[in-house]
Design a protein with these regions (language model features):
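A conserved regulatory-domain signal marking ACT and ACT-like small-molecule sensing domains
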Residues: 66-163
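Charged/polar, solvent-exposed surface patches and flexible loops
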Residues: 4, 19, 23, 57, ...
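Fold-independent oxyanion-binding glycine-rich loops
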Residues: 12-15, 20, 34-35, 42, ...
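N-terminal start-of-chain detector that recognizes signal peptides
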Residues: 29-30, 57-62, 99-105
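Glycine-rich phosphate/pyrophosphate-binding loop at beta-loop-alpha junctions
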Residues: 1-4, 41-91
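Active-site-adjacent helical/loop segments in soluble small-molecule enzymes
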Residues: 1-53
Length: 163
C-alpha cells in the first residue's frame, strides 16, 4: 500500500534519532518520542532540497518512557562516535590497569564500563571496557595509544550484541 501512496521512504539511523531526542530535552526540557523525532532527524539528509523553503515537522512526545533515557543517551553517544567498547587483554599483574589509565586514555576520556574477571594460572585476562570521549576526533589517538603501548584489544562497536 505504501508504494502507491508515498513518493519515497527514507531511513534514519537509530543513533541519529536518539541524538535528536536528546537535543530538545537538553536545550529546552522538551520530551520528544522516537517517532516524533524522526522528521527532525531526517532534515540534515534533505538540506540541499529544502534550503530556502518552509518546512513543517510534526513533533510528538507522549509515547516516551523516561526510564529509557539512559539507553537513548548510550545509542546517541555510539552514533556520534563518542562512546566505544573494547575487549582489552590485560596482563595479569599488579599495575596493569594503572598503565592502561596512564598511557591509553587521553585527559578527557572516561571509563564508563569495566568488567573484568581475574583468571588464575593465566598470563592475560580479558576485560570489557567502555570509553567515552569528549571529542570524536580523539578516537584515532586512543587506538594509536593501544598500539603504541602494546595493549591487545578488539573493537566492539560494529556489533552491539557484544556489549
Amino acid at each position: 500500500i505504501w508504494k502507491e501512496v508515498l513518493e519515497k521512504m527514507h531511513r534514519v539511523p537509530e543513533g541519529k534519532v536518539c541524538s535528536t531526542i536528546l537535543r530538545p530535552y537538553n536545550e529546552d526540557a522538551i520530551v520528544v518520542e522516537p517517532a516524533g523525532a524522526l522528521s527532525i532527524a531526517a532534515l540534515d539528509d534533505f538540506a540541499g532540497e529544502i534550503k530556502g523553503k518552509k518546512v513543517v515537522c510534526v513533533i510528538s512526545g507522549s509515547n516516551n518512557d523516561i526510564d529509557r533515557m539512559q539507553e537513548i543517551k548510550e545509542r546517541s553517544l555510539l552514533y556520534e562516535g563518542l562512546k566505544h567498547y573494547f575487549i582489552v587483554r590485560f596482563a595479569q599483574r599488579p599495575g596493569a590497569l594503572k598503565e592502561f589509565v596512564n598511557h591509553i586514555l587521553g585527559p578527557d576520556d572516561d571509563i564508563t564500563r569495566f568488567e573484568y574477571i581475574q583468571k588464575h594460572n593465566k598470563e592475560i585476562g580479558p576485560a570489557l571496557v567502555g570509553i567515552e570521549l569528549k571529542y570524536r576526533e580523539d578516537y584515532d589517538k586512543l587506538v594509536a595509544n593501544f598500539k603504541k603501548y602494546n595493549f591487545q584489544f578488539t573493537e566492539l562497536n560494529k556489533d552491539d550484541s557484544l556489549f
